[in-house]
């Protein structure tokens, strides 16, 4: 409240500045005192001239203030004397010099990811599904060990009478000597040389030096087979897997009764045998041999069906002819291609045109003469006609 009173007092002093004589200049002293002791500057108030509104708003001088008069109201104020004694008044510190120490509250931020609690898993003992030691199972004796002895009458006698059968078939057969129709040592068969080993050399007139191409005949049966590397699909070392012992290693011991009961079969055959009839043995007919044996080799059947020698011969000749004809056909195609290329190159050049025409004629003649012999060879190598010359296959 004292602060508010002091401020009200200051406002009254400022308001009375207009009515106080200017010689005292109280407001200036107050302003300087406030500024000196408290550091406060009061605002300067400008009072408008309400009586002379048309006058310029210039600050009046000291002489002008002396001459101002108030015609409308004459106020005679007694002279006011101020005795100002300034004392050092200890005012409370409105603005504190040292800021108070503000203790901020410590805020504990909760853990967003809390630590998981340690859960103690209880140890569960799993019972043995299959016990290691199986119990011994005692099988009840279905068949009793001590069976009663039942005596059955003897229908069949213990000792049968011996019956002697006469020897109808003689034991010692007469030895019959058969002549050697098929000789032990077969004769050597010479196959005629239809294909000559050395072919005749055909001399071609050297009209143009020709280098014939070297034709490699393919091997019918390859000597060296290609090595094929098979990738190791199956690993060399297989992983070892341990199979769990589902079935126990030691099987249970089962006691089986060792005593087997003796069962007596009744004698179905009667004791007294009746007189049996005559026993008929089968008659065996031996093959009758001719009285006059042939001196020469036997004549084979006209048809060679079922003859093993003929079958082998025909198969071998058939395979050889097919292989040989394939080789001849390949050689013919390659030779024809080479000669046609040579003749076309000669005929295309005008300088060697005459030689080219001769080449075409020569090509036709030589191909016909060479391969006519091969065609005749094909006819001679028919399996049936060729195998007729082989003995034992006529």
Swiss-Prot record:
Disulfide bond positions: 310-393, 313-387, 343-359
Stated name of the protein: Saposin-like protein 11
Glycosylation sites recorded in the entry for this protein: 25, 272
Family matches, as InterPro entries: Saposin-like, SaposinB_dom
Entry keywords, A to Z: Disulfide bond, Glycoprotein, Signal
Domain of life: Eukaryota
Signal sequence interval, chain numbering: 1-18
Domain Saposin B-type: 306-394
Alphabetized SUPFAM superfamilies for the sequence: Saposin
């Amino acid at each position: 409240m004292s602060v508010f009173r002091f401020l009200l007092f200051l406002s009254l002093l400022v308001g009375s500045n207009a009515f106080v004589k200017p010689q005292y200049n109280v407001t200036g002293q107050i302003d300087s005192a406030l500024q000196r002791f408290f550091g406060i500057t009061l605002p300067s108030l400008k009072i408008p001239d309400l009586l002379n509104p048309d006058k310029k708003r210039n600050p009046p001088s000291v002489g002008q203030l002396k001459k101002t008069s108030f015609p409308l109201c004459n106020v005679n104020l007694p002279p006011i004397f101020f005795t100002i004694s300034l004392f050092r008044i200890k005012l409370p510190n409105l603005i504190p010099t040292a800021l108070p120490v503000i203790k901020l509250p410590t805020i504990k931020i909760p853990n967003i990811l809390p630590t998981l609690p340690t859960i103690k898993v209880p140890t569960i003992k799993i019972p043995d599904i299959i016990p290691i030691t199986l119990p011994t199972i005692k099988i009840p004796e279905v068949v009793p060990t001590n069976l009663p002895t039942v005596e059955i009458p003897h229908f069949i006698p213990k000792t049968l009478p011996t019956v002697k059968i006469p020897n109808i078939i003689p034991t010692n057969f007469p030895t019959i000597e058969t002549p050697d129709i098929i000789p032990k040592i077969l004769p050597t068969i010479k196959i005629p040389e239809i294909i000559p080993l050395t072919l005749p050399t055909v001399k071609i007139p050297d009209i143009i030096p020709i280098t014939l191409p070297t034709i490699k005949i393919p091997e019918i049966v390859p000597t060296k087979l290609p090595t094929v590397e098979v990738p190791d699909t199956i690993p060399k070392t297989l992983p070892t897997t341990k199979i769990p012992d589902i079935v126990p290693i030691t099987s249970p011991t089962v006691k089986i009764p060792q005593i087997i009961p003796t069962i007596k079969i009744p004698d179905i055959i009667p004791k007294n045998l009746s007189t049996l009839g005559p026993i008929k043995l089968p008659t065996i007919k031996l093959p009758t041999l001719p009285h006059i044996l042939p001196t020469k080799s036997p004549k084979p059947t006209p048809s060679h069906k079922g003859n093993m020698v003929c079958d082998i011969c025909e198969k071998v000749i058939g395979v050889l002819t097919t292989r040989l004809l394939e080789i001849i056909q390949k050689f013919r195609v390659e030779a024809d291609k080479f000669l046609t290329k040579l003749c076309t190159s000669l005929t295309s050049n005008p300088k060697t045109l005459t030689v080219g025409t001769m080449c075409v004629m020569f090509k036709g003649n030589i191909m016909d003469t060479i391969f006519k012999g091969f065609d005749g060879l094909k006819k001679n190598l028919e399996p049936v006609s060729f195998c007729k010359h082989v003995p034992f296959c006529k």
